[in-house]
Amino acid sequence: MNDKFFDLKQEKQDRMINASLKIFSRGGYRHASTDEIVKEAGISKGLLFHYFGSKLGLYGFLFDYSARFMLLELSREVKRSETDYFALTKQMEQARMQVMKLYPYMQRFLDVAVKEEHTEAVERIAEKKLDYEDRLRAYSMQADYSIFAPYGDSVRVTKMVRYTIDGLTDEMSERYDFSPEKLFAEICAYLDTLRRMTIKET
């Protein structure tokens, strides 16, 4: 991590992080402009490079910070004993909602970054990306997917859930009255509906 950067006041750190997350999440590494980042953050380009050295240095820091922050929040919200797929999904979305309150573009940045194709960027985050994806997979593997077997295909159901959450996030984040809490409430309502459609409760 970057000790010099963390000596800054928290407000300035968050301003620079949020600006960088926003710009990198729009079109990936190749299309992100440091000019746009410094304009969004309200700082000089010299200051940005003082702390991160280069665009690639900033990108590497940002992925490391975001993955650590997201995984920490997931560890707080997700119960290790939880095996109910829909309850587990709600806990994971609760964690993402908490992250979104402070860093609105962090989840989107991570989603874009794991699909990044720019060679230098891919190499820079390769090790951290592997760890991040392994940790996310471990949470997903807690769920008991056998509950879907008599009534539906678990792969299709989980894809349907993911598409629903992603679609709601894209739709609601564009609204003028958007809030992470409203998004989470809507996601939970849809998850409850999908549960009734896919599981026959005993």
Label each PLM-derived region with a short phrase.
Residues 15, 23-57, 61:
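Helix-turn-helix
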Residues 26-30, 81, 103:
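Short coil/turn segments at alpha/beta junctions that flank glycine-rich nucleotide-binding fingerprints
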